[in-house]
């Protein structure tokens, strides 16, 4: 809302009349129901991704889907093992499809590969919460995890799969 009413009018290169009459201005409100639209007329026209007001909007439907899955897992009363099962499903989908897919599979303006790949990290992080791994979140373990993770970079497939566990641990350990 602030992007449309404050940022857009201040930064647009088109006239105010053109800005407010534009279909793109009204269309930007579709972001409120997670139908992602990046553009406002005449705003950021010279960026590498021209006209994109907020290029991180792609993550909103992905995040919403992850939180919705957490609610569903909680609703069926299988939080600990349900979260682990979700993490394993997302890992299997990542290994079996998302890394090998050559074409985007877009639903509701969201690339399903991104949903799967982000789902791995989200649910591994959720597992760390469920299984109380946070007792290991300190600088010593974080630095050790970074060193082990980087040592695995010699073997790309192992490194990628290890990233699913190491990156959430490292981020959460440094963040606490």
Language-model segments: residues:
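Transmembrane alpha-helical segments
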Residues: 69, 73, 120-132, 167-175
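Alpha-helical transmembrane segments of multi-pass integral membrane proteins
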Residues: 122, 147-176
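Solvent-exposed interhelical
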Residues: 64-92, 129-141
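Aromatic-anchored segments of alpha-helical transmembrane domains
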Residues: 89-101, 144-156
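Short helix-capping/hinge motifs at transmembrane helix termini and TM-loop junctions
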Residues: 6-15, 77-78, 100-101, 132-133
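Membrane-interface helix caps and helix-loop-helix hairpins in membrane proteins
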Residues: 49-53, 101-112, 133-134, 151-160
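Membrane-interface micro-motifs in multi-pass membrane enzymes
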Residues: 56-62, 110-123, 160-161
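Membrane-interface helix-loop-helix regions
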Residues: 2-62, 167-171
